[in-house]
Amino acid sequence: MAMKKLLIASLLFSSATVYGAEGFVVKDIHFEGLQRVAVGAALLSMPVRTGDTVNDEDISNTIRALFATGNFEDVRVLRDGNTLLVQVKERPTIASITFSGNKSVKDDMLKQNLEASGVRVGESLDRTTLSDIEKGLEDFYYSVGKYSASVKAVVTPLPRNRVDLKLVFQEGVSAKIQQINIVGNHAFSTEELISHFQLRDEVPWWNVVGDRKYQKQKLAGDLETLRSYYLDRGYARFNIDSTQVSLTPDKKGIYITVNITEGDQYKLSGVQVSGNLAGHSAEIEKLTKIEPGELYNGTKVTKMEDDIKKLLGRYGYAYPRVQSQPEINDADKTVKLRVNVDAGNRFYVRKIRFEGNDTSKDSVLRREMRQMEGAWLGSDLVDQGKERLNRLGFFETVDTDTQRVPGSPDQVDVVYKVKERNTGSFNFGIGYGTESGVSFQAGVQQDNWLGTGYSVGINGTKNDYQTYSELSVTNPYFTVDGVSLGGRIFYNDFQADDADLSDYTNKSYGTDVTLGFPINEYNTLRAGLGYVHNKLSNMQPQIAMDRYLESMGQSADTSSFAADDFTFNYGWTYNKLDRGYFPTDGSRVNLTGKVTIPGSDNEYYKVSLDTATYVPIDNDHKWVVLGRTRWGYGDGLGGKEMPFYENFYAGGSSTVRGFQSNTIGPKAVYGYGAHTDPNDNNDDYEACTQSSGCKSDDAVGGNAMAVASLEFMTPTPFISEKYANSVRTSFFWDMGTVWDTNWDPSSAPSDVPDYSDPGNIRMSAGIALQWMSPLGPLVFSYAQPFKKYDGDKAEQFQFNIGKTW
């Protein structure tokens, strides 16, 4: 039977009504053109079923419903008697998505944006959405000043109704700012105002912040900077009237004109506080005091609002509202500030939760909390918990989130979200210098053993001059009050002459135990006991060694000697760094010392002081200045000298970079008859034949030391934002000296420097790169000594794993 077909609808739903009001009864529904979409799925999306009586409106609704599924780019509905024939053309399926020519936008970011718009491999292609994406990407390029950019979507058909989608980018070049004009300024010059902008029409070579490339977002920030500049100086009526951005015909240049009205300067006449102050009116009034005749300052007003919110937050009012309304009196040029405060409800903490701590146990994090469950919410206590977690050094990032409990008017949960870092490290170091050659060191350290917070270290060194092993364990919470307990045992076989030090061998072993007592949030006192056995041999007589032996009642030509010492160890630590892992703000001071106690063969004391201060110079803490110092002093007691093997040394990656480790400071002056190792090429003699002694390049250290360093940390070039918190670049200037306060110049040959002079300061400068790698912290440094003395040994390139600062 010839099929009688009637076209009743199309893509634009523009067909005429042909059935009349009564319509017809559908006895069957057939589809043509389905490939990927199942018949059942298509039927479910239709409002019409077999047996329904349909009219023109029902058919139009059917077409709309099928289009709404997003699976079809064309739909036609035909009638064959009482059968509906639905002809569809499915949208093609995306088989692959590729990008070409995109440099400013990474592939991953493009994929995320496409997926957010429903464009992904395996999904059907919506050409309308594709056009919107093209326009959106071009708008993005325009916003960053690339006005010649274009984005085209190239769709290549494939068999089985599939397509390849390729986005082709022509980014062009960024339009550069030719001139920035500010019209209407009288109190301040245009140059002064523009000097605070990120966008510039001229950028000196030394300015690493300014940028001539136009970006819409940066312009918005600069306009806000301009507004704040005037409001902070009393111009309460200041207004930006308009902003024009003009493009040159070749789309490579930008002219920016900002029209402003400065107005007059206004002074504050008073501050009136009203509203629900939750019983803290006296404290709030202290925060709103102003000096008589003080200029209106927008930043101070904002800070005052924030201070009031913080004050109320400390008492559990988590969501206070503080609004300041300036009342401007144009007659006498004054502003009265009306501050309305609504403290809101007082909130209590139901639970404290931790997220992201896959290795660290909850108890390790919970013991750092100062906010208690069941107590009212204290914003300062929550922040203290965040600071303490950061200072542990276990985490790359720590964030807090205060979540309201559903159905409760006054309860919240506090969530700490942490991102753990690798707290274990291989302490492996390599150094190379023109004189020293290659040197090695190794060890293993785990600062968060099995997630318990215990610090466990197994360190060992094996090279031509030393065999060293150490096991150390520290429990930071030996008691619930935070008293720590640490201990270690060690063995050391040290051939000093092979290490470019004075000639002797020391085999030592010992142990110590230390308790740490937290005084407050930032201060800790430590006290402990130690024991060490030193067995000296192969000692070649030299002046510093002779002084020590004589003070111990030994002959100057003694070649071997043993001593057992018991010490009282003490220390104090002040730590207010923002985090233990790559700090960017705050200070740390560490004082350590020890003194021998009765029962010891030696009688002496030693004190060391280390300080580090980080000062960020931008709001994002990406540019940081670091100042470090290290001081040390020791001396004998009861007429005895401090053992020469306890001397301080300087030089190397942790003190003065660019110098070989431990080589700065006094050198050995060997006595008559002293013999050196014939394989030792560092000395210019085999046997000393001068009665006054022979100088050498062998370092002996000193009983006093001073080291300082100034470091400028910058963002690391070519590093993505993902790794910005794991890599640190710095330029440094190191200086330091070691001296012997007991040195007598008259006891040495005339060609020997005065080693009691602290003014023999060494200096170096260079660049360093630190990377928190999966193996632990890696430190690369290159330094050039520019002030050194005879006998000093340079080591320009140094590389270490396991040391950061």
Swiss-Prot record:
Gene3D superfamilies: membrane protein fhac, membrane protein fhac: a member of the omp85/tpsb transporter family. It holds the Pfam family POTRA. InterPro entries: Bac_surfAg_D15, BamA/TamA_POTRA, D15-like, OM_assembly_BamA, POTRA. It comes from the Bacteria. GO terms for biological process: Gram-negative-bacterium-type cell outer membrane assembly; protein insertion into membrane. Residues 1-20 form the signal peptide. Keywords: Cell outer membrane, Membrane, Repeat, Signal, Transmembrane, Transmembrane beta strand. Residues 24-91, 92-172, 175-263, 266-344, 347-421 form the POTRA domain. The keyword Repeat applies. It is found in: Cell outer membrane. One of its GO terms (cellular component) is Bam protein complex. Part of the outer membrane protein assembly complex, which is involved in assembly and insertion of beta-barrel proteins into the outer membrane. Constitutes, with BamD, the core component of the assembly machinery. NCBIfam families: OM_YaeT (TIGR03303), PRK11067.1 (NF008287). Belongs to the BamA family. Part of the Bam complex, which is composed of the outer membrane protein BamA, and four lipoproteins BamB, BamC, BamD and BamE. This is Outer membrane protein assembly factor BamA. It comes from Salmonella choleraesuis (strain SC-B67).
